[in-house]
Amino acid sequence: KDTLYNKDQTSITAEMQTRFATEKKQQENEILNLQVKSESFIKTIFIIAAGLLLVIAFFIFRGLRQKQKANIALEEKNKIIEEQKQTVEHQKHIVEEQNKDITDSIRYAERIQNAILPPEKQWYSIFPQSFVFYKPKDILSGDFYWIEQKGDLVFVAAADCTGHGVPGALISIVNYNLLNKAVLEKDLNNPADILNYVNHQLTLALHQTFQESSVKDGMDISLCVLNTKTLELNYSGANNPIYIIHQIENAVTRISEVKADKFPVGAFVDEQVQSFTSKQIQLQKNDLVYLFSDGFADQFGGDKGKKFKYKQLKDILLENQNLSMIEQRSILENKFTNWKGKLEQVDDVLVIGIKV
């Protein structure tokens, strides 16, 4: 009985050991499987993370590369811009130097032109009661005034040469010298003879003929010769008339216009050199004579931006005839400035007033 019991115990023990061993093996397998799965999961996570890092690194690298290319392109553009800027600055400097040289030359020419105009002392010694309103459009002027005296005869002119600025100034100097030559060398006293002489000499000096229709270097002028003893005024004009205000007692004062020949000095009409005519006017003491170019009347301005015109000029002269010549000049200057306003001056301006 004891032996049988012992066998049963042994069998039970062996079975339990076998079962324990089997369960242990299963647990070990499960643990192993878990370890394998865990390692596989970790490996997958690592691969995904590595892939993401590679993608991120790629985009970062590409962005840096594009930025580098953009920086290089920007540097190239900046370099080109800087080179262009330096070129422009250099050219600007050259232009400024050239402009300075040109302006200096024009200023010097201005001094030469002003030097040939009658000095104030000479002018006012001949005509104490007079004025000259002279306002060039540019530094140099195509307008000029001229005066000369021989015995009892006084020669006075207001001239407007073709153009303004440098071209007008060059022609004005030529014509100024021709007037001097006509009176002082050729001893001409009649204003028509003087203009005919200047006309002939000007065409020779400029090699100008009727065949050269493109050449239009001429001069509009009003030329007066006053006999200071008899007060007879001899006048000849090329396009430019003169105004006279006669001081007559107990009569309505009017302004009269002495008309000019309708062609300029230096012109050909119908293939012929034109001859100027002269007109004689007997003046009285205190009569007023006005000579002028077209610059004042042609100035645009006023509320509507229109030309000033000769009628307004006549009205101003007539309204202010009893004022001194200095006051008349001041009124003309103020009227011109106010009329022009902010508009550009269109031409040289010259107005001469003389009280006989």
Task: Annotate the PLM regions.
Residues 35, 63, 160, 294, ...:
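Conserved acidic
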Residues 7, 245, 268, 299-300:
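Residues that scaffold the ATP/ADP-binding catalytic core of kinase and kinase-like folds
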